[in-house]
């Protein structure tokens, strides 16, 4: 089978990137032919498919700011290069991952219009929450945008900025639930919790499947794996939406120590237990 994988970055940057690259390796081992569509970026893995990648955009002041602001809505460069890749590779399936902002869901529409099956693995709550993490201003758990996307404007959830929140609101209006359901055959959620949230957000249950993220057991289980220590271990990015604070608080009531491995905005707070 010919499968086109898409993710905004194509290097081991974060969980979505790691999942995409690991999936590519697994599919190839299973005998499938795989192509990649991502954004141009200096750290990307070298690939012959990069000639189809749209240029890098940076969401900060500069000459490319206008292109960056338009990219979430589907720019001509993305449409042109993605269409060229589809025409040259002729995939049976387009498998999307984290595509918002740098690529945009316009690629799902293009694939659907060509009669190609579209699968979309979700790595956050962007289809439900314009901010993507269901945390109002990065702090308070909030699901109000499930039913009313205007709440992102009311609370200025995007970087406490009215402009950034306005752009996120219009992005969510353009790529609304009805439009995305038409061009996506299956939404894959890595947990039952996310799948339930998608249903609560009004997405068609028939299009929602739960497929947990996988690991390569051969890489995880070494010869000395039986030598276990008396501790729990968290490995991942140390940011508010990961629930690290809650985990550390819960660990105080557990019999073993907690080992935390990772970096991010909360790294300093994890070390000295200060969160401000």
Language-model region placement:
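A conserved catalytic-core segment of Leloir-type glycosyltransferases
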Residues: 29-93
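Nucleotide-activated donor-binding/catalytic signature segment of Leloir-type glycosyltransferases, i.e.
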Residues: 260-262, 267-276
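Membrane-proximal helix-turn-helix segments that form the acceptor-binding/catalytic region
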Residues: 113, 126, 142-187, 196
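N-terminal subdomain of nucleotide-sugar transferases
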Residues: 1-43, 87-89, 113-117, 249-252
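Acidic anion/phosphate-binding donor-loop and adjacent secondary structure
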Residues: 199-200, 205-210, 214-230
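Conserved donor-binding/catalytic core segment of Leloir-type glycosyltransferases
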Residues: 188, 224-242, 248-255, 259
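Carbohydrate-associated surface elements
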Residues: 40, 193, 214
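Short donor-sugar binding/catalytic loops of nucleotide-sugar-dependent glycosyltransferases
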Residues: 9-11, 214, 235-239, 264-265
């Amino acid at each position: 089978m010919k499968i086109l994988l898409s993710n905004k970055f194509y290097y081991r940057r974060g969980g979505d990137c790691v999942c995409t690259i690991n999936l590519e390796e697994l599919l190839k081992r299973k005998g499938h032919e795989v192509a990649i569509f991502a954004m141009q970026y200096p750290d990307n893995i070298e690939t012959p498919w990069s000639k189809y990648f749209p240029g890098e955009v940076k969401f900060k002041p500069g000459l490319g700011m206008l292109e960056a602001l338009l990219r979430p809505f589907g720019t001509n460069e993305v449409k042109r290069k993605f269409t060229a890749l589809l025409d040259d590779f002729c995939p049976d399936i387009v498998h999307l991952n984290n595509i918002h902002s740098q690529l945009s869901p316009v690629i799902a529409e293009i694939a659907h219009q060509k009669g190609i099956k579209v699968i979309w693995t979700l790595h956050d709550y962007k289809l439900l929450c314009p901010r993507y993490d269901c945390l109002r201003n990065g702090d308070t758990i909030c699901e109000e945008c499930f039913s009313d996307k205007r709440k992102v404007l009311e609370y200025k959830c995007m970087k406490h900025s009215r402009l950034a929140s306005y752009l996120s609101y219009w992005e969510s209006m353009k790529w609304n639930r009805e439009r995305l359901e038409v061009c996506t055959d299956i939404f894959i959620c890595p947990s039952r919790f996310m799948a339930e949230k998608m249903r609560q957000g009004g997405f068609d249950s028939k299009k929602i499947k739960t497929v947990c993220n996988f690991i390569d057991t051969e890489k995880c289980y070494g010869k000395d794996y039986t030598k276990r220590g008396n501790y729990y271990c968290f490995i991942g990015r140390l940011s508010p939406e990961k629930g690290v604070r809650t985990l550390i608080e819960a660990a105080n009531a557990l019999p073993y120590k907690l080992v935390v491995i990772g970096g991010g905005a909360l790294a300093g707070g994890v070390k000295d237990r200060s969160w401000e």
